[in-house]
Design a protein with these regions (language model features):
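Terminal presequence/propeptide segments associated with secretion/organelle targeting
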Residues: 3-688
Length: 688
C-alpha cells in the first residue's frame, strides 16, 4: 500500500516535477508522451495563488481561474457591512468595476535550475548540525539573491527528496490582482461541512481574478483554452498545481511521532478554534461575515487532519509502512556501498526526539512564522512580531537572516505587512483571549514567561489591553516602524510591540531547536534519497513542497460499500439534493438558482472525479486534457483521498473537480456573464 517513494509503473500516483515528468508511466499505460513544448505551456499557464492555492491563466488578458474557497480571503477583505461578496458573490461587468485585492499575489513558474552541487559544496560532512544549518542558509540566500538580481524574477531554492536535491525556481510575480467574478457561497460550498471531502458533490467552487501590469490587464502568452464540453469518462487528464505538503517519505518513527504527538495537538487546537469562531459567528450576520473565511479554513483543516490521523491509526496502513521500510533496509544491508546509509535512520530518530521535547512550547510560542505562534492568535501580534524581528534581521548579512527576511522574500513579506485589509477589534480580542488561555493552560499558570505575558491580568483583560492599546492597525505606523528599524522601536510605547519583544528570545531558542534538528533530518533523508536513486533510478517523485507539480489519471468512478459511485454529477442532481434536504442550510440554494433553474440544461455535468493524485494545495488546479485544454477545476478530494498525505491508493481515492461544462453553463445562464464566457471559450479580446 505505501512506499517511501512511489515508483509503481501502472499506478496513477505521483506529484511529478515538470523537469522530471512521468514519461514512461504515461507512455506505458496511456500511450501519451508529453512534449517539452506541451510541458512548458502547462507550466507557464499555471499560477500559484497567494500562499497556499493554485490556479491558471484562462485568457490572454490575464484572467485567472481558481476556487471560491481559495479566493475567500480576498472576498472577505473586500467586503464591508453593506457588501458581503463572500456570501452574495460578485461580478464586474466592466474592467473599471474589477476590485483590487489588498494583499493577493500570483506567482508563475518560469524556469527550474538544479543547484544541488553548489548547496552541498557549502556544507562539508565535518560540520555539526548548527554549523551546517547556517552554511546551508548562507549559500541558499546567495543563490536566491544572485538569481533575483540577474533575472528580476522572484527566486526560491527548493529542497526536494528531503534534501537529496536542491533546485532554483524562478517566478514572475503579479501583485496587482483584481476580483472579476465569484458566485454565492451557498452554491460554491453547497452542502457545507457535511459534504466537505465527500462525493458525490454539487459545488460551483470557482472564482475569477485578473492579473494587472502597469495598471492594465496583463497580456500573457501562455493560457489554457477552456473546452466547454468538459471531459468524458475514462479520458486521460492532468492536474497542474501546487500541492502543499506530504509525508510519503517519512520513516516509521517519524510517522509515529506525527500520529501520537503532532496531529493530536493540532486537532485539539483546531477543534477549540472552530467552536470559538462558530459561536461568535452565530451572534449576528455581521459577526458571521467577519469570521466566515477563517472558520471555513479551520473546519477544512480539522477534517483533513482527522482523516490523516485515522490513516495513521489504521493497523493495516502502519504494518505496510513497517514492511516497506524493513524491505528497504534489507536492500541497504545487502549493498556494502550503501550499508552506511542505515545510520540515517538513527539520526532521524535522534532529531525527532529533540523536536518532540519542545513540541508544545514550540508550537505555542513560535509555530509557523506566518501564524506567529498558536499562543498568540492575532493578526496584530503577527504584525508586531514582523516589525520586531525585521529590526533585528534586516541589518544582518543576507545569508545570516531568518529565511523570511532574506532579500528574496522581502517583497512577499512587505505585501502582507502593509496590507490595508480591515482588522476587527472584536475578532482580535476573541482570538487572542482564547489563545492566551490555551497558552496558560498548556504551559502552566506558574510558568514565568506566562506570568509576564499575562501581566497579572486574565487572558480576556490582557487581550483587551493589547488590542485597544496598539497603534498597529494604522498602516502608516507600520511603515514608520519598519523603515526606522531598531532606532524607531527603541522607546516606542506600544503594548503589542512590547509583547512581541518579550516573547522573542524564547521563541527564537525554540525555533533554533527545530531548525537544527531539521538540518540533521535533512542530511539523513538526503542520504536515504540518494540510496534510493542508486537502487531505483530517477523515475521517482519527491514529497510535495508547495511548488508546481504534475499529476495524471483518468476520469473514473469507484465502488463504495458495494455500490457504484458514478464519475459525474449533474445540475439535476443538485436540485434533487436540495429538495431532499428541503432546501435547508447547508443544502439551501441561492435565490437566483431557484428563480432561474428553468434556464439551465439540467443534464449538464456539474462535478466529476479523477484518479489523479492531489493533496491540500491543489485546490484551484486546472484539469487539462491531452490537447492542453482546461476541462475542469480541482476543488476537493473524497474522504478516501485524505490518506494521500502518506500514500496513494487508486482503488477509491479520487480528486473532485468542477466540470468546465458547468462553469460555462452557469456563467451564461445564471449570471448573464456572456462576455466572460466569450473570453474563456474563445479567448476574445476584452471589450467590456
Amino acid at each position: 500500500m505505501a512506499v517511501l517513494f512511489q515508483d509503481r509503473a501502472f499506478a496513477d500516483d505521483g506529484l511529478w516535477l515538470f523537469n522530471n515528468p512521468p514519461a514512461k508511466q504515461l507512455k506505458d499505460k496511456y500511450h501519451f508522451t508529453p512534449t517539452s513544448a506541451w510541458l512548458e505551456h502547462i507550466q507557464k499557464s499555471s499560477v500559484r495563488v497567494g500562499r497556499g492555492g493554485s490556479g491558471s491563466f484562462v485568457s490572454p488578458d490575464g484572467l485567472v481561474l481558481t476556487n471560491h474557497h481559495i479566493g475567500s480571503d480576498s472576498l472577505q477583505k473586500l467586503s464591508d457591512p453593506t457588501h458581503n461578496y463572500l456570501a452574495d458573490g460578485f461580478y464586474a461587468h466592466t474592467l473599471s468595476e474589477e476590485k483590487q485585492c489588498p494583499d493577493l499575489e500570483l506567482n508563475v513558474l518560469q524556469s527550474i535550475q538544479d543547484v544541488t552541487e553548489r548547496v552541498n559544496a557549502a556544507v562539508p560532512p565535518s560540520m555539526n548540525a548548527g554549523q551546517a544549518f547556517l552554511a546551508r542558509n548562507r549559500v541558499i540566500a546567495d543563490i536566491e539573491r544572485e538569481s533575483q538580481n540577474t533575472t528580476g524574477l522572484h527566486s526560491e531554492v527548493v529542497k526536494l527528496y528531503g534534501g537529496g536535491t536542491y533546485q532554483l525556481y524562478r517566478y514572475k510575480r503579479y501583485t496587482d490582482v483584481r476580483l472579476v467574478f465569484a458566485p454565492e457561497k451557498r452554491i460554491a460550498f453547497f452542502g457545507g461541512d457535511p459534504d466537505n471531502f465527500e462525493y458525490p458533490r454539487f459545488d460551483l467552487d470557482i472564482c475569477l481574478f485578473r492579473a494587472y501590469e502597469n495598471g492594465q490587464p496583463a497580456h500573457v502568452e501562455n493560457y489554457l483554452k477552456v473546452n466547454p464540453q468538459g471531459p468524458s469518462e475514462h479520458d486521460l487528464v492532468f492536474v497542474s498545481g501546487h500541492p502543499g505538503h506530504t509525508n510519503r517519505q517519512l520513516t516509521v518513527s517519524a510517522l509515529t511521532d506525527l500520529r501520537d504527538r503532532v496531529l493530536p495537538f493540532q486537532l485539539q487546537t483546531l477543534y477549540r478554534r472552530e467552536v470559538l469562531l462558530a459561536a461568535f459567528g452565530a451572534h449576528s450576520l455581521e459577526n458571521q461575515r467577519r469570521i466566515d473565511s477563517d472558520l471555513f479554513g479551520i473546519r477544512n483543516s480539522r477534517k483533513r487532519s482527522d482523516g490523516q490521523l485515522a490513516t495513521l491509526l489504521s493497523s493495516d496502513f502502519f504494518a505496510a509502512r513497517v514492511e516497506d521500510e524493513n524491505a528497504f533496509r534489507s536492500e541497504l544491508e545487502n549493498q556494502p556501498a550503501l550499508r552506511p546509509v542505515l545510520d540515517s535512520y538513527n539520526r532521524i530518530d535522534q532529531a525527532e526526539n529533540e523536536m518532540m521535547k519542545v513540541l508544545v512550547s514550540g508550537f505555542l510560542l513560535e509555530g509557523d512564522w506566518r501564524r506567529g505562534g498558536l499562543g498568540f492568535d492575532s493578526r496584530l501580534f503577527r504584525i508586531a512580531r514582523t516589525l520586531v524581528r525585521a529590526a533585528v534581521e534586516r541589518p544582518k548579512p543576507n545569508g545570516e537572516r531568518l529565511a523570511e527576511y532574506r532579500d528574496s522574500n522581502r517583497a512577499p513579506l512587505e505585501l502582507q505587512l502593509f496590507s490595508p485589509a480591515p482588522i476587527y477589534d472584536d475578532v482580535e480580542e476573541l482570538e487572542l483571549s482564547d489563545s492566551l488561555t490555551d497558552l496558560a493552560a498548556r504551559l502552566g499558570p506558574e510558568d514565568s514567561l506566562v506570568k509576564q505575558i499575562l501581566a497579572g491580568k486574565s487572558p480576556g483583560e490582557r487581550a483587551h489591553e493589547l488590542v485597544s492599546g496598539t497603534k498597529l492597525k494604522d498602516v502608516t505606523v507600520r511603515h514608520q516602524l519598519y523603515e526606522g528599524g531598531a532606532a524607531a522601536l527603541e522607546g516606542y510605547s506600544d503594548p503589542m510591540i512590547a509583547l512581541a519583544t518579550l516573547v522573542d528570545p524564547a521563541a527564537r531558542r525554540l525555533r533554533r531547536v527545530f531548525e537544527e534538528s531539521s538540518e540533521t533530518e535533512q542530511g539523513a533523508y538526503g542520504q536515504i534519497a540518494r540510496a534510493r536513486f542508486a537502487l531505483k533510478g530517477n523515475e521517482i517523485y519527491p514529497d510535495a513542497t508547495g511548488t508546481l507539480r504534475l499529476s495524471f489519471g483518468e476520469v473514473a468512478g469507484y465502488e463504495e460499500d458495494g455500490k457504484a459511485v458514478p464519475a459525474f454529477t449533474t445540475f439535476a442532481g443538485l436540485y434533487q439534493r436540495a429538495n431532499d434536504h428541503q432546501n435547508r442550510e447547508p443544502f439551501d440554494l441561492p435565490p437566483r438558482w431557484i428563480d432561474r433553474h428553468d434556464k439551465l440544461n439540467l443534464g449538464t455535468r456539474f462535478n466529476f472525479v479523477t484518479t489523479a493524485d492531489v493533496v491540500g494545495g491543489n485546490s484551484g488546479s486546472p484539469v487539462v486534457n491531452e490537447a492542453g485544454e482546461l476541462v475542469g477545476l480541482i476543488f476537493d478530494g473524497n474522504i478516501q483521498s485524505l490518506a494521500g498525505d502518506f500514500a496513494y491508493s487508486g482503488e477509491q481515492s479520487r480528486s473532485v473537480a468542477v466540470d468546465a461544462a458547468a462553469i460555462i453553463e452557469a456563467l451564461d445562464k445564471m449570471y448573464d456573464a456572456k462576455p466572460l464566457v466569450d473570453e474563456l471559450v474563445a479567448g476574445k479580446p476584452l471589450s467590456r
